[in-house]
């Protein structure tokens, strides 16, 4: 289960980076902000999973 959540976090981070880059390329501030938000969500999920791992081992 934890592996699934970790891969989900990485996927959110990657999608966020891509969306942010696309937003910058076309000059769309909203898309850029949404990309940053997705990256932050992925970062938070990854931090949560790392915290869980600390208590498991």
Curated annotation (Swiss-Prot):
Protein name, as recorded: UPF0337 protein SCO0678
The organism's place on the tree of life at top rank: Bacteria
Regions of compositional bias (Basic and acidic residues) in chain numbering: 1-22, 42-57
Annotated segments matching region Disordered: 1-57
InterPro entries tied to this protein: CsbD, YjbJ_sf
Sequence similarity: Belongs to the UPF0337 (CsbD) family.
């Amino acid at each position: 289960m934890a592996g699934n959540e970790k891969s989900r976090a990485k996927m959110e981070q990657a999608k966020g980076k891509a969306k942010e880059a696309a937003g910058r390329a076309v000059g769309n501030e909203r898309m850029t902000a949404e990309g940053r938000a997705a990256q932050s969500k992925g970062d938070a999920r990854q931090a949560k999973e790392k915290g869980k791992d600390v208590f498991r081992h």
